[in-house]
Amino acid sequence: MESYFPATFFFCRCLKYMSDYTNCLLQGYGVLPSAPTKVRVPHIDVEFAIIDWDTPNTLADTVQHYNIHYRKMATYDNEYHTIPKVHSPFILEHLSSNSDYEVYVEAVNSHGVGEPSARVVFRTENKVRNTVMCN
């Protein structure tokens, strides 16, 4: 009797990459938007930042919404958090003060998710500000 465990095990491990594989194929067909351009952080505060970007150079007219991915740097989990279905400008809230964050944006159309934008790193403001004491 033949064992199907190895093939099934490896197949299941690959399932989590299927959306990436599909997006790669669709990029080749030219139906996905290119990466959003000029991602910037024009305003940074203690617990929030405003993220802004321009439309993709390719297939911008097909974009339905954007996904923002962000993570706090120098932490143990270093996992990206995703906020789907947003538009520019976007207020990224509930951040920690005096912390470094990395953010990137993806454009989404009816065919799938396009290439990610360039990553942008920023630091939130410090909650405790230095004050000068006058005598």
Question: What residues fall within each predicted segment?
Answer:
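Extracellular low-complexity, O-glycosylation-prone stalks/linkers
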Residues: 1, 11-93, 100-135
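Short hydrophobic targeting helices and cationic amphipathic motifs
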Residues: 5-6
